[in-house]
């Protein structure tokens, strides 16, 4: 590393080299920078090689042209009579910046000018360099802009995606309004094999049990953002974006082989976070709620979701909650990500578990539960190497997690064992075991 006189010689040679390098001068160069802050005071500073490239040489006089309102300002070359500032050059110690010891700088520290041209909540500014003009404009503070929209309107409006209708039904009972609902049941392999199209089933379930104003029966991967933006323009601001992203490919219930196969045929749900994040950028909700299985938290998809939301300005809270700690019958753990423009979200505190036996709930439905003792799937439970859910018995104090395959009578479904017989829980019993309100209609 050159020092002393050698350092000066090194810098001099570097400047000579820069003079003869065939640098192409573009029409426009842009940057996005943060204000330099000293206490409560802000400085607008651009330290860049591109200033020189675009014609703003060290020693040049410049003048400021304020924009309209708080729209920033422009900088143009100026003569001695009109100049208010000057372009200068910063020299770095060769030890720390030997590859680039010189850099051209424009700086503005007058608080009157800055406060007149940039809102107080602005944290960053955009720089557009052209030949003979540099334009500084404020970059909107996303979190502030979102929060500001709810000063004169209710925040209890939601964009709800992929819930099957249950979450919306409960939300409406709590005073929320589902302005826009995105609901579409993906076509599964068993649907294709049987020639069925059930893409509207969850959507119809939503309409039976809730009152969305706008219903989008579209695949989350193919929803056009321009159309979504146009629909949002017809709505009041959205306070909550609620996503129950597909959990199959994060769940231990799906085999590694099936997960690989779903990647090949594009039925995987791992990448649902990508369209969800793009939609959140358009919806601009004050709060985002993502619900999934616990494995989602440690997955690449979960990391991408959380990191991107933090970059957007949201404060992140993650938690894994067990239904038994909140009055449910199922020992079902779910992961929740709450991303809010308001800091300080406090997760709900677990309640004391009831601890009583579950049989009174089961017994009143037992007459409607089918006897499936002789089914092959029941016999297969004894020979499989996989861990099967425990039978519901007179001694049970909780219910294992009920999967979406429950109704198909698979071997790892939840069953009742009593008096030497095996029973398949009825629809009404499953609804009660899953703590789905009686008011939720599944009879249609």
Predicted regions and their residues:
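Class I S-adenosyl-L-methionine
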Residues: 230-235, 250-408, 417, 421-423
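Beta-strand-rich non-transmembrane domains
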Residues: 32, 36-40
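Extended repeat-based interaction scaffolds and adjacent low-complexity, acidic/S/T/P-biased segments
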Residues: 2-7
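Core alpha/beta nucleotide-donor-binding catalytic domains of modification enzymes
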Residues: 147-284, 294-298
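C-terminal target-recognition/interaction regions appended to catalytic cores
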Residues: 9-27, 40-42, 50, 59-149, ...
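Short polybasic/polar patches that bind polyanions
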Residues: 52, 172, 310
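Eukaryotic intrinsically disordered and solvent-exposed regulatory patches
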Residues: 47-51, 167, 323-324
């Amino acid at each position: 590393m050159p020092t002393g006189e050698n350092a000066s010689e090194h810098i001099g040679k570097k400047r000579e080299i820069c003079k003869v390098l065939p640098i192409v001068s573009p029409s426009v160069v842009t940057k996005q920078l943060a204000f330099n802050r000293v206490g409560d005071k802000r400085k607008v500073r651009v330290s860049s090689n591109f200033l020189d490239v675009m014609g703003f040489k060290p020693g040049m006089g410049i003048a400021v042209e304020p924009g309209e309102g708080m729209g920033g300002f422009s900088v143009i070359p100026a003569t001695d009579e009109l100049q208010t500032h000057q372009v200068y050059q910063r020299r770095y110690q060769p030890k720390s910046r030997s590859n680039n010891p010189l850099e051209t700088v424009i700086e503005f520290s007058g608080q009157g000018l800055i406060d007149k041209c940039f809102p107080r909540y602005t944290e960053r500014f955009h720089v557009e360099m052209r030949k003979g003009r540099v334009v500084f404009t404020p970059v909107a503070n996303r979190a502030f802009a979102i929060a500001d929209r709810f000063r004169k309107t209710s925040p209890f409006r939601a964009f709800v995606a992929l819930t099957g209708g249950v979450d919306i039904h409960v939300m409406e009972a709590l005073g929320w309004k589902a302005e826009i609902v995105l609901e579409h049941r993906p076509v599964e392999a068993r649907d294709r094999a049987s020639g069925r199209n059930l893409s509207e089933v969850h959507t119809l379930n939503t309409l039976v049990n809730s009152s969305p104003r706008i219903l989008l029966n579209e695949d989350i991967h193919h929803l056009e953002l321009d159309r979504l933006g146009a629909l949002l323009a017809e709505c009041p601001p959205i306070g909550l974006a609620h996503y129950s992203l597909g959990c199959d490919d994060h769940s231990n219930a799906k085999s590694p082989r099936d997960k690989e196969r779903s990647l090949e045929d594009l039925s995987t749900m791992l990448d649902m976070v990508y369209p969800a994040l793009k939609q959140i950028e358009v919806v601009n909700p004050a709060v985002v709620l993502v619900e999934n299985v616990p494995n989602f938290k440690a997955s690449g998809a979960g990391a991408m979701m959380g990191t991107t939301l933090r970059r957007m300005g949201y404060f992140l809270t993650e938690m894994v909650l067990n239904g038994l700690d909140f009055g449910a019958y199922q020992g079902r753990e779910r992961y929740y990500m709450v991303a809010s423009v308001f800091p300080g979200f406090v997760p709900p505190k677990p309640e004391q578990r009831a601890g009583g036996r579950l049989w009174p709930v089961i017994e009143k439905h037992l007459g409607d539960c089918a006897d499936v003792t002789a089914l092959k799937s029941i016999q297969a439970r004894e020979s499989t190497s996989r861990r099967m859910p425990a039978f519901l018995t007179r001694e049970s104090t909780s219910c294992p997690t009920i999967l979406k395959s429950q109704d198909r009578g698979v071997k790892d479904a939840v069953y009742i064992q009593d008096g030497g017989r095996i029973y398949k829980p009825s629809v009404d019993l499953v609804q009660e075991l899953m703590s789905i309100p009686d008011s939720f209609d599944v009879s249609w």
